[in-house]
Amino acid sequence: MIPLVSVITPCYNGANYIAACIESVLAQTLVNWEMLIVDDCSTDNSAEIILSYVKKDTRIRFFQTNKPSGSPAIPRNIAIDNAKGHYFAFLDCDDLWLPRKLEEQYSYAEANNYLFVYSNYEKITSEGIRNERVITVKSQAKYSDILKSGEIPCLTAFLHRSCVGKLRFVPAPKEDYVFWLLILKQAIVAYNTNTTLALYRDSLASRSSDKVAMLKNQWKIVRHLERVNFFYSLYCMAIYSLKGLRKYIR
């Protein structure tokens, strides 16, 4: 029997999208999953929508934060702490999976004895319209690789719970990137299935309007958090900037 997969979904004011997000999980061809949705004190009717699905499918579990955290990190950590699965997968409330996402990634990981896999993804409009804007990422990612690129799309990550252990998301800018660094620092390598398995909603709200702030955050992580030497940090930043430019013009 295929081991249980825990789907981790933070939600904040996602009433316009959360139903479609849940439906994309319900449509998975791999059916042995649990979906842990953690509402971060939404002020819209997100919780009401989520609870309507909880009543219909016992695989969906609902949690709430005690107070607004202002970051997906805390809701994700709550979900991880309560997860029962052998594998973890991450899906934000405004994104979607294609139906074979979990099955393909599980099969790929098992066939190759990989602990951590990810995939390419397609950008869609805020209204959910697909326009073939596929983002292809590197075929594998080591710690040294993502210092320069950060390219492990959170909505496509699929990893064995042994990778996570006691590690948790840090409430800070680029919290998913810092989490991948912590995991890959354990000499773990992540591998791309080289297929497109998820849909990323490319809305104005999801784009950073301050590219300078993004670069500053990247520098803080590489230079100060990871304590990479000054000149190699500059090299990493140059590569990161070039890759970021290519990403935002696609």
Residues of each region from the PLM?
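Short aromatic/hydrophobic "clamp" motif used to bind/position activated sugar donors
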Residues: 88
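Conserved nucleotide-sugar donor-binding catalytic segment
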Residues: 81, 137-213
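Cell-envelope/extracellular polymer assembly enzymes that use nucleotide-activated donors
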Residues: 3-6, 24, 34, 178
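Conserved donor NDP-sugar-binding/catalytic core segment of glycosyltransferases
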Residues: 100-131
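Glycine-rich, basic loop-to-helix element that forms the pyrophosphate-binding segment
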Residues: 65-83
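A conserved hydrophobic helix/loop-capping motif in glycosyltransferases and polysaccharide synthases
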Residues: 5-17, 21, 28, 38
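A conserved acidic beta->alpha catalytic loop
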Residues: 24, 39-48, 67-69, 92
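Acidic helix N-cap motif at the loop->helix transition within catalytic regions
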Residues: 17-19, 44-52, 96, 100
